[in-house]
Curated annotation (Swiss-Prot):
It comes from the Bacteria. The keyword Nucleotide-binding does not apply. PANTHER family: 50S RIBOSOMAL PROTEIN L15 (PTHR12934), LARGE RIBOSOMAL SUBUNIT PROTEIN UL15M (PTHR12934:SF11). Residues 1-45 are annotated as: Disordered. Residues 1-13 have a biased composition (Basic and acidic residues). Binds to the 23S rRNA. Residues 21-35 have a biased composition (Gly residues). One of its GO terms (molecular function) is rRNA binding. The lineage of its organism: Bacteria, Pseudomonadati, Pseudomonadota, Alphaproteobacteria, Hyphomicrobiales. This is Large ribosomal subunit protein uL15. The keyword Secreted does not apply. Belongs to the universal ribosomal protein uL15 family. Part of the 50S ribosomal subunit. GO terms for biological process: translation. It comes from Rhizobium johnstonii (strain DSM 114642 / LMG 32736 / 3841).
Amino acid sequence: MKLNEIKDNEGSTHSRKRLGRGIGSGSGKTGGRGVKGQKSRSGVAINGFEGGQMPIYRRLPKRGFNNIFASDFVVVSLARIQTAIDAGKLDAKTTVDAAALKAAGVIRRVKDGVRVLADGEIKAKITIVVAGASKPAVEKIEKAGGTVTLLSAPAAAE
């Protein structure tokens, strides 16, 4: 059997039902929507409405909150940094910081800082200055002969 001889199983595909194309088609006029009412109109579905039953979003209790002071770090893996070094976009001899990562195209925006995670391997000996790094990431960088400097978070205004 060749690739061009493959066919769908019998009855597995259906042709599209053309609605509202005359009474003889069997699905003309109302097109399977019944007569009148909200569901016969366009733009029907009411999200979260369960027909008078208490909807799920009201049956379940409220939980948690959004912390407006939470730090939003941009996450970068060691693999991404190593790829940028291999491609010549990052210089391993200079200090790697948020600005250098942005200039190299590793990250798009800085937000509240950069956090390095240990996904992948790092071969280059780099000096990196970031807002955060996971313990395995720090261990991998130091094992490769590099150093990690963590920036202290700015003090909250009082």
